Amino acid sequence: GCKSLLFFSVLGLLFFSSCRSTQSFTSPLPEEYSIRMSKSSASGYKNVKRVRKYEFTHRDVPAAFDGCRLGFVSDLHYRSLLKEKGLRDITRLLNNLRLDALLIGGDLHEGCEYVPDVIAALGVVKTPLGTYAVLGNNDYEACYHDILKEMERQGIHLLEHKADTLKRNGGR
């Protein structure tokens, strides 16, 4: 059910995040395993380089998740690749998308002194089903415990050696 939704959503996002095509794509998989992708070339946010929208269906995902909006963000590398304005743009964009849940894929920062700022910014994204994160290689360095503390303070669920089940409209 929901675990399949999360697994296939993350898998699809990771797979298609490296695509450079601006054309729409329909998966050759059967309808019950369908992922449709389109790339939005202009996000309206100067510092946000790429926004992609996917529609996903799977026979095991309950009808309660119809219209569920998941967001995925990763590799922000705050302060080397992404500056303050870009971080504000991303959090504003994520809030404007009215997501049900946000998935964070790690590599959030480029220095321990930036951990509180980047996690606080992501913590203000309003998601009724929650914000979930995994850590990247940059996140396991010197400030690992600072990241854990900041994520807990912001209500971000760290999925480290564990899983969670999303619940929506009576479905799981």
What are these regions (language model features)?
Residues 47-49, 64-149, 153-157:
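Membrane-embedded segments
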Residues 68, 171-172:
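Alpha/beta-hydrolase fold active-site loops
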Residues 1-69, 80:
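Acidic, histidine-bearing metal-coordination/catalytic regions of metal-dependent phosphoesterases
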Residues 54-58, 162-169:
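Short acidic-hydrophobic surface loop/beta-edge motif
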